[in-house]
């Protein structure tokens, strides 16, 4: 189930990160924790907090709330393995510990976690969500945070050769996202 897949992914990410965290530091293994809250039609629901990622090879419905943050959903239709991340910033300051709060870390970690869970890299398909400019004061400023988050996600996916098959990005309103790991379906509602 999701917990067994999560344990395998955590072990893989721990090895890949190659760091022993000091007290208070986030590890790659910590970002795959998930928060189950109910089931719908027998499918477990999970809520994904910012700075985390979720991967499962079994049916699961994952939801999150996005403003300027971005979520990348990846899905392998053959292996039926899917995952979602939720990052806050395009990249972290220099000499910052690796964290899924940053797009430059969260997107590669998500790719690696899906491969560790049985997905084939060449079969992955991406969907990108979020990146709104929700603060009125920044709506006229070129290069707002949401736009930068979207640009980082798209650049990494392009560099990895992963096609973006759907997106709902930018704008001025937040979004509620629901993603199904077993079939790649996604629903978005403006907030």
What are these regions (language model features)?
Residues 135-147:
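Phosphate/ribose-phosphate-bearing ligand recognition and processing surfaces
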Residues 27-40, 44-64:
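Phosphate-centric recognition/catalysis
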Residues 123-130:
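Short glycine-rich phosphate-binding loop at a beta-alpha junction
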Residues 146-191:
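Divalent-metal-activated hydrolytic enzyme cores
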Residues 2-8:
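Extreme N-terminal basic, low-complexity initiation segments
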Residues 48, 79, 101-105, 109, ...:
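Conserved active-site and cofactor/substrate-binding residues in soluble primary-metabolism enzymes
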Residues 57, 76-80, 180-183:
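Short acidic-glycine loop/turn motifs at beta-strand connectors
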Residues 62-117:
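Conserved mixed alpha/beta catalytic, RNA-binding, or beta-rich assembly cores of soluble enzyme
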